[in-house]
Amino acid sequence: NFSLKFIEQSSQIKSFNRNGDSPKVYIADNSEIFIDEIVKEIKLCQEKGFQSICLICKTEKNSTYLFNKIKHKLDIQLIKNGSVSDLQGVFILPVYMSKGLEFDTVLICDADSQNYHDEDDKNLLYVACTRALHKLSLFCENEVSPLI
């Protein structure tokens, strides 16, 4: 199970298998390709019939930045505070707001070495990865996190 690499082996967490493809990691050489790859993946997931698609970023600042880059390319909702009542559609939110939620598809959109590099970040990656019910993709610009 992909997400188990982010927790201590001695933990008493029981995992269960999710249906779907193995997670994919996308590495882009520049920000234009990075945004294009994310938009392409969202559209592909919509074509496959996934009803809830969530883009998860480490921070609210990263979420807002990404939202501003892609809001003109597709219908997406930025969640900054409060709760999400209807999990249908495309959302972007920081990882701390994703705990307890599940989505058909999750795209972790800042999975680079700058954002995820220490033990605390390992726990955040675990939370983000386990939000996906069927499909998980990780995106980074330039250098992938050493935790992945």
Predicted ranges, named:
Residues 1, 11-20, 32-36, 43-142, ...:
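Core RecA-like ATPase module of SF1/SF2 helicases and allied nucleic-acid translocases
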Residues 8:
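Nucleic acid-machinery interaction/catalytic patches
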Residues 27-29:
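Conserved AAA+ ATPase "SRH/arginine-finger" region at the nucleotide-binding site
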